[in-house]
Design a protein with these regions (language model features):
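Conserved beta-strand in the GNAT
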Residues: 45-47, 101, 111-113
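Active-site beta-strand termini and strand-to-loop segments that position acidic
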Residues: 37-42, 102-105, 115
Length: 116
């Protein structure tokens, strides 16, 4: 899993639900709420933190693999008030990869990725 501290707990969970994650488990750790979110084999641990940086740093990005990058881009731009990067291509792996990046409510970068 990938841990994500937040002082915007509800907003963060809602954001990840909207891009396909489902709540896997919820816990209380002392005075902090913890929510585990799952998308296929990827687990995010979202936990309350009163002194969060609100910028990239806790992680640089997470990548979500998709089968159709153009459909994912269309969904994100039509359903969410976000300004993603344009779909880009890199010559990684055997045939390359296409991707775009959005920014979550804590400044985290979320990459949508399609292997070609």
């Amino acid at each position: 899993h990938v841990g994500l501290p937040t002082d915007r707990y509800e907003e963060t969970i809602s954001f990840y639900h909207r891009i396909g994650f489902e709540t896997y488990d919820t816990e209380i750790n002392g005075a902090s709420r913890v929510c585990f979110l799952r998308l296929n084999d990827l687990i995010l641990e979202v936990y309350e933190c009163s002194a969060c940086t609100q910028q990239t740093g806790a992680w640089d990005h997470i990548a979500i693999n998709v089968c159709d990058i153009d459909a994912a881009f269309e969904y994100v731009t039509s359903e969410m008030p976000l300004q993603p990067t344009c779909v880009q291509k890199l010559p990684f792996f055997e045939r390359g990869v296409r991707f775009f990046v959005i920014t979550g409510p804590n400044g985290e970068r979320v990459e949508f990725n399609q292997y070609l």
